């Protein structure tokens, strides 16, 4: 592991650790934590939040937001079409698209859920009591949260995860098969750090989603990927964490290795275990007094939130528009999501509200991560117009000296799910996307019949095995390419499993997005 380079003299932070969980809104996860800290813009029994069962029906009953969330089995809608209805209270009409949908009333969550499945509004219109999430309860009490952090896109997982490290999704709002195979071409914060002489590391438990980015597939970055189980605690203990750390989760729910990404219908207690494990490893590290640990969620997953999504002043990052039928302009944000800041330089019980710039309409959103990384490490350039606009959160570091009272351990979460993992379940959209990326690396992307079978006819357990094998093959062949003296900027993928020299450099992609049409179910 390369030596961790000193950060900016203006800040005590030398290592930033990022963990991005899946598909939970702020109110669903932390709304009821207002009972612990009135500073939080959440919910209380004395100020009920609700949605009409159907916003177009004046006689429709109201669905009140409750605090009874435990194990959530249904997977609510969270496509760009679903979120339009959730935010504006009316369904998207492809025949008469509305360029000015009006205010973000946040009134369509219940009706969208019922449209998906009768009774689903009960899951969507409920949140967790603080005691149900004991790890988060202690983090809220001991460190900082932000109650004005929004997803970068009112869309699903993939585009929002792309924004986290590159401040753009390169025009994608859904499953862009061609770009998944080739890799998204935009510059990332990883390259900015590397160019400035800083180090980064990706600690994966399953297939690393950072391979969505084409440039992260280069030979020179192969050594930046580390097996979480083998390396993370070791690097923490030995003080060898790099300047920028990304912890990736288990995305597939298996009997022996349950998913810990918080995506419904995965057990949130497994995500709590992961957060606890990461925190305790960081807390025991000799680097603890130089660490800022950030936890956020990629998007809200269709769960209710009462804070209107920002509609004004949001810049398109790079001038690229989304594909038909939405032709999204990337000029409004997604729904509010939970975000934590953890460091001994933060006062306990801190709540970060709206951004203080750099522009009047700036907001905290996923592009705030590369924007703040740039600021703390004094990097040269922004990635896009979006991170140059996004609020930065270095102001959460307020102390003149590190605290000595940060808890060394966190509470043990209690299992919520009474059943076992559904290894034979169909794949979620995001799990399909991982399969497509894996097929690109393994060389199976040219076999249309096989690719369709992998995405639409494969269960969770088999998909997990496939992506793991594909990644292992990618690493193996990349090592061979390096040993043969391959250029460090080469990007390799396998074309024939029976050939020991099956590495080629893919042709460069066009800069414009392909907007490939995904398969229909």
Swiss-Prot record:
Q: What is its EC number?
A: 3.1.4.3
Extract one GO cellular component term from the record. membrane
State whether keyword Cytoplasm applies: yes
Cite the CDD domains for this sequence: AcpA (cd16013)
Entry keywords, A to Z? Cytoplasm, Hydrolase
**Does the keyword Hydrolase feature in the UniProt annotation?**
yes
Q: Spell out the subcellular localization from the entry.
A: Cytoplasm, Cytosol
Q: Which residues cross the membrane?
A: none
Loss of function: phenotype: No visible phenotype under normal growth conditions, but mutant plants accumulates reduced levels of digalactosyldiacylglycerol (DGDG) during phosphate limitation.
For bias type Basic and acidic residues, the affected ranges are: 478-487
Region: Disordered, residue numbers:
478-521
Write down the chemical reaction(s) this protein catalyses. Answer: a 1,2-diacyl-sn-glycero-3-phosphocholine + H2O = phosphocholine + a 1,2-diacyl-sn-glycerol + H(+)
Q: Where does the entry say this protein is expressed, by tissue?
A: Specifically expressed in flowers.
- Record field: compositional bias (Polar residues): 511-521
Q: Per its record, what are the GO molecular function terms?
A: phosphatidylcholine phospholipase C activity; phospholipase C activity
Describe what upregulates or represses it.
Answer: Slightly induced by inorganic phosphate deprivation.
Question: What is an annotated GO biological process for this record, any one?
Answer: phospholipid catabolic process
Entry's family note: Belongs to the bacterial phospholipase C family.
| Role played | Non-specific phospholipase C (PLC) which assumes minor PLC activity during inorganic phosphate starvation. Can hydrolyze both phosphatidylcholine (PC) and phosphatidylethanolamine (PE). Required for normal accumulation of digalactosyldiacylglycerol (DGDG) during phosphate limitation and may contribute to the conversion of phospholipids to diacylglycerol, the substrate for galactolipid synthesis.
Q: What's the protein name?
A: Non-specific phospholipase C5
């Amino acid at each position: 592991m390369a030596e961790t380079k000193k950060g900016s003299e203006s800040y005590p932070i030398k290592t930033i650790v990022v963990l991005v969980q899946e598909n939970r809104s702020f109110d669903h996860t932390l709304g009821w934590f207002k009972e612990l800290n009135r500073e939080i813009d959440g919910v209380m029994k004395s100020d009920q939040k609700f949605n009409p069962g159907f916003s177009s029906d004046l006689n429709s009953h109201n669905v009140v937001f409750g605090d009874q969330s435990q194990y959530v089995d249904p997977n609510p809608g969270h496509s760009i079409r679903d979120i339009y209805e959730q935010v504006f209270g009316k369904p998207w009409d492809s025949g008469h698209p509305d360029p000015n949908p009006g205010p973000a009333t946040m009134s369509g969550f219940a009706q969208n859920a019922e449209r998906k499945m009768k009774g689903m509004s009960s899951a969507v219109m409920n949140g967790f009591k603080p005691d149900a999430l004991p790890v988060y309860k202690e983090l809220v009490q001991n460190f900082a949260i932000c109650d004005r952090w929004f997803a970068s896109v009112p869309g699903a997982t993939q585009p929002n995860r792309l924004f986290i490290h590159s401040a753009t999704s390169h025009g994608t709002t859904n499953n862009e098969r061609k770009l998944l195979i080739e890799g998204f071409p935009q510059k990332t914060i990883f390259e900015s750090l590397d160019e400035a002489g800083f180090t980064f590391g990706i600690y994966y438990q399953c297939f690393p989603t950072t391979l969505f980015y084409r440039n992260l597939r280069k030979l020179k970055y192969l050594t930046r990927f580390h097996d979480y189980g083998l390396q993370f605690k070791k690097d923490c203990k030995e003080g060898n964490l790099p300047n920028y750390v990304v912890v990736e989760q288990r995305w597939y729910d298996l009997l022996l290795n349950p998913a810990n990404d918080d995506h419904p219908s995965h057990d949130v207690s497994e995500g709590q275990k992961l957060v606890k494990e990461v925190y305790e490893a960081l807390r025991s590290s000799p680097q603890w007094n130089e660490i800022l640990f950030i936890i956020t969620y990629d998007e809200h997953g269709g769960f209710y939130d009462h804070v209107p999504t920002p509609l004004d002043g949001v810049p398109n990052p790079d001038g690229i528009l989304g594909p038909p039928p939405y032709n999204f302009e990337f000029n409004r944000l997604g729904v509010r999501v939970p975000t934590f800041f953890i460091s001994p330089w933060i006062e306990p019980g801190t709540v970060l509200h709206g951004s203080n710039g750099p522009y009047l309409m700036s907001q905290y959103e996923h592009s705030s991560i590369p924007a703040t990384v740039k600021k703390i490490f004094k990097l040269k350039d922004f990635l896009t117009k979006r991170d140059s606009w996004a609020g930065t959160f270095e102001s959460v570091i307020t102390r003149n000296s590190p605290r000595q009272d940060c808890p060394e351990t966190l509470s043990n979460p209690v299992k919520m799910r009474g059943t076992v993992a559904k290894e034979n379940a169909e794949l979620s959209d995001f799990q399909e996307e991982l399969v497509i990326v894996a097929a690109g690396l393994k060389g199976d992307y040219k076999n249309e019949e096989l690719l369709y079978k992998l995405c639409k006819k494969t269960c969770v357990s088999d998909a997990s095995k496939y992506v793991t094998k594909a990644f292992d093959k990618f690493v193996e062949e990349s090592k061979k390419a390096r040993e043969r003296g391959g250029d460090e900027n080469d990007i390799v993928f396998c074309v024939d499993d029976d050939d020991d020299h099956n590495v080629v450099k893919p042709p460069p992609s066009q800069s414009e997005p392909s907007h490939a049409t995904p398969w229909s179910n």
